[in-house]
UniProtKB/Swiss-Prot annotation:
Gene3D superfamilies: 2.30.30.30
Stored NCBIfam families: rplX_A_E
A single GO cellular-component term on record: large ribosomal subunit
Family statement: Belongs to the universal ribosomal protein uL24 family.
rRNA-binding recorded as keyword: yes
Organism for this UniProt entry: Methanothermobacter thermautotrophicus (strain ATCC 29096 / DSM 1053 / JCM 10044 / NBRC 100330 / Delta H)
Name the record gives this protein: Large ribosomal subunit protein uL24
Disulfide bonds: none
Stored Pfam families: KOW, Ribosomal_L26
Gene: rpl24
Record keywords, A-Z: Ribonucleoprotein, Ribosomal protein, RNA-binding, rRNA-binding
Length: 117
């Protein structure tokens, strides 16, 4: 892997979906960190997150959508009003989020947590 910033940016821009998923990780809360023995996890629809930066700082809500193409996450309650009056989710970068509660509906995800613990 290159050290050159331009090549780093190029990799992020052209990354395949399986690599983008890993890049869409957020830190775990202290309690979850102690429970699972790891620092971060890729975000998933249904996870409860806390917003750490920006206009919605301090807000907690469920992840409604993870957009791998744009590297953005949409959180329930973090919405803005468009000029025409419609309400849309505000796109948030995963680095500005902290996972407070995990969505453990998926068996594979549970196995991942057990494996790393």
């Amino acid at each position: 892997m290159s050290k050159q910033p331009r090549k780093q940016r190029k990799y992020i821009y052209e990354a395949p979906l399986h690599a983008r998923r890993k890049m869409m990780s957020a830190n775990l809360s202290r309690e979850l960190r102690e429970e699972y023995g790891r620092r971060s996890l890729p975000l998933r629809k249904g996870d409860k997150v806390e917003i750490l930066r920006g206009d919605f700082r301090g807000h907690e809500g469920k992840v409604e959508k993870v957009d791998l193409k744009r590297y953005r996450v949409y959180v329930e309650g973090a919405t803005i009003q468009k000029v025409d009056g419609t309400t849309v989710y505000f796109p948030l970068h995963p680095s500005n989020l902290r996972i407070v509660d995990l969505n453990l509906d998926d068996e594979k995800r549970i196995k991942i947590l057990e494996r790393k613990g």
